[in-house]
Every structure is written in C-alpha cells, then in structure tokens.
Regions:
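Extracellular beta-sheet-rich ligand-binding/adhesion modules
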Residues: 1-208
Length: 208
C-alpha cells in the first residue's frame, strides 16, 4: 500500500496475517489506540520520498521491520518491535522518540542518514532471533547523529555491539541486565559513557 492510516476507523479493527506473509508500505503508517496489530509477518517500508511518518499508538510490530529505499521516515511516537529493526537505506529519524527492539541492524553499506539524537534504544534480545549481534552497524556511507542518545542492553550474551568500517561518534551505552561474556567491538568509534549497572552479573570486554 502507499499510506496506511487507520485514523477514524470504527469497531476496534484488527490487522492480521501469519509469519509467512509480508506487508509493504510505500509511504506513512498511522495506527490508532483502539486497534490490534496481530500481523506476524515482516513489515517493509520502501518509500522513495521524504517526509514519511510512522505513528504506532502503542502498538508493537511482531517481526522484523525493514526500512529500504531512498526515502525518509520519522517517528511520531515510540516504536516497538519484538525482533529486528533493519535499516538498509534512506533516512531514519527518531525525533527524540524511544525504540525497543531485539536487534538494530544497518549493514548494507548503502547511503543512510540515521538520527537518534535525544532517543533511548532499548535492546531486548530475543534468543531465537536470526540476528546474532543486538547492535550491528556498517559505518561506510552512513551519517550518524547520536547526541544525547542512549543504547540500553537488558539481557544480552556474547558480542553485544559491533561497528565496522568508517568510525562514528556514539553517545551512551548502558548495561542494565546480565551481559555475561558480552563484548563491544567499537571499530574505532568514540563513546561518551559505557556503564554497567550495579546489579549486572558477568563480564564485559571492550575492543576499541
């Protein structure tokens, strides 16, 4: 579809589908509070235009959400998906809203503009997810704006942060759960704060 806007819909609508189906949106998306999102498949945002807005109204995505195409997307409110947020190309701006996902993946090497300023990204890893590393980013052809942003880990094992190729500036990383043998492979990136919570059990290695 071009734009999906549920504003004004009556009778508590439900969007449904199994995990073999996909939903492709070529513009903006607006959910409403009275609806239910039971769609289990992947969702693809594939606009070639700027100015697209995503408004979730408290609804979660139940599978990977993929942003690809040369367009631009901004968040109108907080964004939650139980699996991966995959940013392949285009422009993605959080507008100070918060994100919760299992993985944030941006490895394509295509032109990307990523603005997470003033936002918190909660990485709540789903252990049977196909993606190994909760945060994995290829710095080539990427513009990153991260001032006053936070990456918060809750329940991760092994490699938790991987950035490679062109180095970027990140802000804060917090571990509030148990990283166990967690590791940060920084790829030459700079950080403001890397902090492990007082109740966190395990070890964390840092490879700059």
């Amino acid at each position: 579809c071009r734009n999906m806007n549920w504003t004004g819909a009556l009778y508590e609508p439900i969007i449904a589908g199994n995990n073999t189906q996909t939903l492709r949106i070529y513009g903006s998306l607006t959910f409403i509070a009275s609806m239910t999102n039971s769609f289990q498949g992947k969702v693809y945002f594939e606009s070639i235009e700027q100015g697209n807005m995503i408004t979730c109204a408290g609804k979660s995505f139940n599978n990977d959400v993929v942003f690809q195409g040369s367009g631009g997307w901004s968040l109108g409110d907080d964004f939650t998906c139980t699996r991966g947020l995959i940013f392949q190309s285009g422009s993605f701006q959080t507008m100070g809203k918060n994100i919760s996902c299992s993985n944030f993946i941006s490895t394509s090497g295509l032109n990307r503009y990523l603005d997470i300023e003033n936002s918190t990204i909660n990485l709540v890893y789903l252990y049977n997810n196909v993606y190994y590393c909760p945060w994995e980013v290829n710095g080539d052809n990427l513009t990153l704006k991260s001032q006053k942003s936070n990456l918060i880990y809750a329940n991760h094992n092994y490699e938790t942060f991987r950035h490679y190729n062109e180095a970027k500036e990140y802000n804060n990383i917090f571990y509030n759960g148990s990283p166990y043998s967690g590791s940060i492979n920084g790829g030459g990136c700079s950080f403001n704060i890397i902090q492990v919570g007082v109740d966190t059990v395990g070890s964390l290695s840092y490879n700059p």
